[in-house]
Every structure is written in C-alpha cells, then in structure tokens.
Amino acid sequence: MDLRAADAWCEDRGVDVAFLRVPGTAIGALTPAVRDGFDLLEITTVLRARPGAGDWERGRIRAGTSADAVELGEIAATSFRPWGRFYADPRLRHRADELYRTWTVNSLHGYADFVLVSDDDGPSGFVTGHLDDGVGRLGLLGVAPAPPWARLGVVTRLLRSVLDRFGADGVSRVLLETQSHNRPMQAVLTSSGCTLDSVSACLHKWYR
C-alpha cells in the first residue's frame, strides 16, 4: 500500500476525505496508515451464510419500489445510530442520517440489485441486496422504531427472506457485513447460522 501515492492522488484531485479498508490479513498496514493521518473508526466483521431455498415473499415481505423512497429513507435515517462508522467520524456525524437516507433511496433506484421490504400495514424495515459474480452481498438492513421484541422479529424475517432471495438468484454463498461492536446484530446473525468469514479495519483521513 503506497500511502504517499494515495495522498498525492487525493491532493491533486481535491478530495476532502479518503476511506481506507485494511483486511485482517494485512493488519501490519494499520500502523503506517495511522501515522499518515488516518483515524481508525471501526472494525468490521464479514459473516457468511448459505443461500436459502424458500419463498422470499412469505411473511409480509415484498419487493421495494421507488414509491417506498420516502418511508424507507425515514427508516434509514434513524436505523444505524450509533453503529455506523459515519457516526464515529466527528466531521461526518451531523450528516450521517442524511447519508444513510440517500444510500437507501439510491438503492431503490438501481444502486442495489434488489430491495426487500417488511410491510406491516406500511414499511417496518428493509434490506438491500447486491449480486457479485455468484456471491450475494447484503448491503443495508434498517428497521423502523419499535419495541425491541418487534424489531428482532422484523430483522429475523428480513434475514430469512434475503437469504431465500439470494438462493432464487442462484448465488453460491452470501456475505453479510456488520460492525464488530454491534453485538445485537452479531447475535442475530450467529443465531441465524452465519459464521465468520473475515475481518477488516475501516479508517478515514481528511485532507481539508
């Protein structure tokens, strides 16, 4: 990893902030990156799961459409506090809600290969999925405010359905990413049969 070349590239192009991900297999690169001005904000875990074989539309799950943009955007704007690394960056924290809102709306308009919605007389949660050369990747999973038991039910329902949807798409495996400190989500994923695939460190560096 040539940090000097990366710095020069960012400076030449007027980049405000650079994001760096260091895989666990290259952990020795962390110290040079921090010395170069990167801030370590998050340790990320990637878990793997088997694709499902059921009907992904069961249990009040449906495909998301552009008509869901406002409601899913509202869910996204509150779902990821305080877990996402954008909340850990003091210069991005005030914009993090809007970032997740935009990310979700863009997913409905083609950034994701599909969006599934849990609909209980209105959206109660959503999950985005990406297809990558035979691998299914879960993007965002957001749940509307509700009592903990109700949120757990929505998360479990969405996880089951997204695995079934990936199975219908013929993927060979599924990867799901979350923060190492997000213990509630870690517990749900492991109880759903997910196993550890890899870890990585996420860092930010501001240039201006």
Which residue stretches match the model-derived regions?
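C-terminal appended segment following the main domain
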Residues: 160-208
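A short, internal acetyl-CoA/4′-phosphopantetheine-binding micro-motif in the GNAT/acyltransferase core
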Residues: 1, 23, 141-151, 178-179
